[in-house]
Amino acid sequence: MNLAKKVISSELEQFEVHFREAVKSRVALLDRIMQYIVKRKGKQLRPMFVLLSARLGGTINESTYRAASLVELLHTATLVHDDVVDESMERRGFFSINALWKNKIAVLVGDYLLSKGLLLSLNNKDHEVLRILSEAVRLMSEGELLQIEKSRNLNLSEAVYFEIINGKTASLLASACAAGASTTFSDSADIETMRLFGEKVGMAFQIKDDLFDYSSKDIGKPTGNDIKEKKLTLPLIYVLNNCSPSLKKQIIYIVKNQNTQKDKVAFVIEQVEVLGGIEYATKKMFSYRDEALELLYRFPPSPIRDALEELVRYTTDREY
């Protein structure tokens, strides 16, 4: 991500100023929590996609910074709510909001972040940015609910899996790129190209996340967390659709009833590896990455395009 950060270093600093301003509150408790959130910032991938998408079309302006802030506010709100739903005590190596301030406050904090983002756009009449991101909220909610609905019977098709990750992950990255582009591009076709570009990157990003569960390099061994949570992701879906009926029955039984037993989870991970699930998912991930790059190459060569290409490659090459 070095090139990406380098070409928009001053813009990223400006974004951080805007973001800190956006989350301020006169309520002492809320302001303290907001400061905690600002301090434990992540990789800022989504704001970077907003800023670079805008730079591809022209000069970054105040509307661009507001779009980047809205995207980050929305993303942070979903993470806070996710931690409550998943009962996660940690996020990015820090205690989660619900771990420190309990569930009720965490839910309200997520609501606050979302409302601040929407008001930021509304008060500045950034109606197109607001429309783009509101669509993302709808798709993300539908994606999460579809996953809950379909995961109950552990019989997920590839098509439904892609529909789920398109909604819960890719839609936000698609909206980030479209929102950024909408602040500088005048041609709606270019904005749509950037939306599609972001969607493809988001699909590749989620498949990479799903692969970590089966082949996590950073901790030396696969975690199997998705299996423990009864989540069917692409590597396992591929194996279930291509293995013998008896093995399929055995794997489904383990995921349903023995998902806390380390040796059983290890058996499932081994089957996914041996039967080509990891290889298949990796190919799909690179296919989405290549589709994203094809869309990006519609724009003339420039340092900004190079930076976006680097970010795309980072999403599939990262080790955490």
Segments predicted by a language model, with ranges:
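All-alpha prenyltransferase/terpene-synthase fold signal
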Residues: 1-320
